[in-house]
């Protein structure tokens, strides 16, 4: 077990891929904002890549260990110290009973991850241990960790000394500028050609009013297509309003003139258009960005997004350990290639489904 001495700014229990299949119930996946760093932390301590671990935001916690344990720290460098002695990131470390791990502020990047051999043993909620702060579920009492709490851990048989290859570590931006991939849709036809060019050729500043629900961006004004300006009144008065529809995770919805990227704890539906979506393989960049950083967006195809996801899955495995050989990597690639690509969503069918759901809900309310 581990005792929380100082909680940090917002340190929470997360697992990967989080709470899957619950959007229909109104619950987002949650999970780590930077799943690349998160999974590698678990690989280092010989856990399954998705085992529950700690996500530390901006300022890390201080923890006291009640038993011997193997740990690994990845992601943003929060200058971890064990009993006052600096310890490295991206490798597994042995911690003895009564030793204290102290973490500070991140200078490059925003989130650090602490994985414990055996994983964190909190009670799953809807199939996941991930903390969803807004609803107060998952993690420890549904909140970020607090001083005095005990973090329960599973038994483990891991050893120290495992390291991640340098070329498998995500490269953090040191100039506060991030290039983020996006896929068009589902409502790209509500924005005109001028609006699309503006979005892809502009820098977008991450506002301070951003969290795990949504990233608010500041930038130029959008322009809209005739579909948005000559729509029916049921869609709302502003061009970016639309009949309530389902949101994909990573949706960039347009609230008036403000783009908001709906991240891990974002809503499952709403009444704003979504001209672009950030694919899952690019989420780690969002997770390591701080308010004041800027994004420029690069459009890619759905097929390219799927390829990036598959490549990242290969990296987030034991193939990235320093001791791994080429044969291990080839075996892992063959395993990944057996996984069928997710079929591209038919947004025409999606729109029809959401419209039908809206009409059914309205009729039910009218009967009441």
Would you name each region that the model predicts?
Residues 1-351:
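Conserved "landmark" site that anchors the functional core of diverse proteins
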Residues 349-368:
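Single conserved hydrophobic/aromatic residue that forms the stacking wall/gate
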């Amino acid at each position: 077990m581990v005792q929380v001495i100082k909680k940090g700014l917002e340190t929470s229990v997360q697992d990967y891929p989080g709470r899957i299949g619950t959007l229909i119930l109104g619950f987002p996946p949650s999970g780590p904002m930077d799943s690349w760093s998160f999974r590698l932390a678990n690989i280092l301590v010989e856990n399954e890549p998705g085992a529950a671990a700690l996500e530390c935001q901006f300022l890390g916690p201080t923890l006291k260990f009640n038993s011997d344990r193997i740990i690994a720290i990845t992601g943003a460098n929060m200058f971890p110290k064990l009993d006052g002695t600096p310890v490295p990131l991206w490798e597994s470390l042995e911690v003895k009973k009564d030793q204290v791990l102290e973490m500070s502020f991140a200078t490059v990047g925003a989130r650090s991850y602490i994985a414990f051999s055996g994983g964190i043993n909190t009670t799953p909620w809807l199939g996941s241990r991930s903390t969803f702060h807004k609803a107060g579920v998952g993690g420890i009492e549904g909140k970020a960790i607090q001083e005095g709490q005990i973090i329960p851990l599973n038994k483990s048989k891991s050893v120290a000394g495992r390291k991640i290859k340098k070329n498998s570590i995500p490269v953090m931006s040191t100039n506060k500028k991030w290039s983020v991939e996006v896929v068009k849709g589902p409502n790209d036809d509500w924005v005109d050609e001028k609006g699309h060019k503006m979005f892809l050729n502009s820098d977008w500043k991450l506002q301070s009013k951003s969290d795990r629900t949504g990233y608010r961006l500041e930038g130029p004004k959008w322009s809209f297509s005739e579909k948005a300006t000559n729509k029916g009144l049921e869609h709302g008065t502003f061009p970016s309003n639309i009949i309530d529809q389902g949101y994909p995770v990573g949706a960039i919805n347009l609230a008036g003139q403000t783009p908001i990227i709906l991240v891990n704890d974002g809503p499952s539906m709403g009444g704003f258009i979504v001209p672009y979506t950030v694919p899952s393989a690019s989420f780690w960049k969002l997770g390591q960005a701080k308010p004041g950083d800027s994004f420029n967006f690069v459009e890619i195809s759905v097929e390219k997004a799927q390829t990036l996801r598959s490549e990242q899955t290969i990296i987030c495995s034991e193939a990235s350990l320093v001791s791994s050989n080429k044969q291990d990597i080839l075996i892992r690639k063959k395993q990944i290639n057996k996984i069928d690509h997710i079929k591209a969503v038919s947004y025409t069918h999606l729109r029809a489904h959401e419209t039908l759901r809206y009409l059914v809900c309205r009729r039910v309310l009218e009967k009441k």
